[in-house]
Amino acid sequence: GWDPGTDSVVRALLELMAPRGITFTNFGPGMSMGHSVAAKAVQGVRAALSMTIPAGAGRHRRLVYVELEPGAELAEVEAAIKADPYFAQDETTVYPVESVKDLQDLGHGVLMERVGTSGQTANQRFRWEMRINNPALTAQVMVSAARASLKQQPGAYTLLEIPPIHCLPGDPGELIKRLV
């Protein structure tokens, strides 16, 4: 998908341009598909929506909206969600709701910022931002990775290890002519 995936490639490009420095990856605001699935897997949860709220400097808050099964106790559900290692590193608040579907928005985003040094020149600042439909972009990146997989030796790869041109449809020569 896009993280890990294309975000890893962008982070690598930022580091290529400023090898010494620090990169902050700030997700959101938006729906985290992975965190929503993890919250829904908690006993007593009928449906869940986890929103990622950027707090800056690579830190995040999680707002988790849950539809409870009949008889489920909010305090137990909240404790189970907060104890999950997937949520443990972030400030997490759990809200009971009548309908998760009424709140659902498939939007998400990311803002990556790098401050670093290129050679001897300090104070380089880079910024990459996107606002997306989470499932649509995830699917697109997966299709591109599947395309690239046909051009790789057998094995397991991260998107960072695959030449970008292998992810694109079309003739490599034409792509180079158009993109360079």
What are these regions (language model features)?
Residues 22-32, 79, 153-167:
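Short alpha-helical "patches" and their helix-cap loops
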Residues 10-12, 38, 62-63, 104-105, ...:
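Short amphipathic alpha-helical patches
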Residues 123-180:
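NAD(P)-dependent Rossmann-like dehydrogenase/reductase catalytic/cofactor-binding core
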Residues 25, 30-147:
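C-terminal substrate-binding/catalytic lobe of Rossmann-fold NAD(P)-dependent oxidoreductases
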Residues 1-43:
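Glycine-/Pro-rich loop/turn segments that contact NAD(P) or position catalytic residues
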